[in-house]
Design a protein with these regions (language model features):
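Hydrophobic alpha-helical transmembrane segments
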Residues: 1-70, 111-224
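Basic, amphipathic juxtamembrane/active-site segments
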Residues: 73, 84-130
Length: 224
């Protein structure tokens, strides 16, 4: 990963002491940012497995699985934070860094959103699998529009309301709420299913918004 500052997602957590310490520790141990990016996919697979296990479990086992999914989502985001810090702040970026920065992110998005959808569907909300796929496609579309802009010589546009941090925050919250509220106050899978609809709507709005902003940047100002 060798992005210039204007092409990096603005994150306040990048200045957090723990993030700086972890990035420095990884750099000292010779861990490449590409390996950190790849690790995010491993955590996404963990999250997918946790959602599917939760669909088969009841009681405390389901609670543990859902909380495990929430933890996996957050660890995926930690990897997304640290890969860039190791690459940029510690000068360990590689020529293939941009590839590792983007592709694992898209794979992780699909694994987590589709996993949540199938988990909710197996729990009894049949249409949730389709909601998961729709959310995943729209999530990838938001990144496509951003990278399209960069390919056209424009700065990366990370505007929301359904950018990656927003999507993962909603999905994490849904997993935690489901763990707490099911089955007494919420039918199993129902919260995840409707949450995926929300994520799809937010991602769709984001794709449209980024497209309009890109078109505006590419359109020359009219002559007075």
């Amino acid at each position: 990963m060798n992005d210039t500052p204007e092409n990096r997602r603005p994150l306040k957590s990048r200045d957090a002491g723990w993030a700086r310490a972890w990035a420095a520790a990884l750099a000292r141990r010779g861990v490449s940012p590409d390996a950190v990016s790849a690790a995010s996919v491993a955590f996404a697979i963990w999250g997918l497995a946790a959602f599917l296990c939760a669909a088969r479990f009841e009681g405390i086992s389901r609670v543990v699985a859902l909380l495990g999914a929430a933890l996996a989502i957050q660890l995926r985001l930690v990897c997304n934070l640290l890969d860039g810090m190791v690459a940029v702040e510690h000068g360990r970026g590689s020529p293939t860094g941009p590839v590792w920065n983007e592709l694992p992110d898209r794979v992780a998005d699909v694994l987590l959103l589709v996993g949540a959808g199938y988990g909710a569907a197996i729990s009894g909300v049949g249409w949730a699998s389709a909601a998961g796929w729709i959310a995943a496609v729209l999530a990838v579309l938001t990144a496509y529009v951003r990278e399209l802009g960069r390919g056209l010589g424009q700065p990366a546009d990370f505007v929301g309301p359904g950018a990656k941090p927003h999507r993962m925050a909603v999905l994490t919250l849904l997993a935690v709420v489901s763990a707490i509220a099911e089955p007494r106050w919420l039918a199993p899978g129902r919260g995840l299913a409707w949450g995926l609809i929300l994520i799809a709507v937010l991602a769709g709005l984001t794709a449209v918004r980024r497209t309009l902003r890109l078109a505006a940047r590419l359109t020359p100002p009219s002559a007075e």
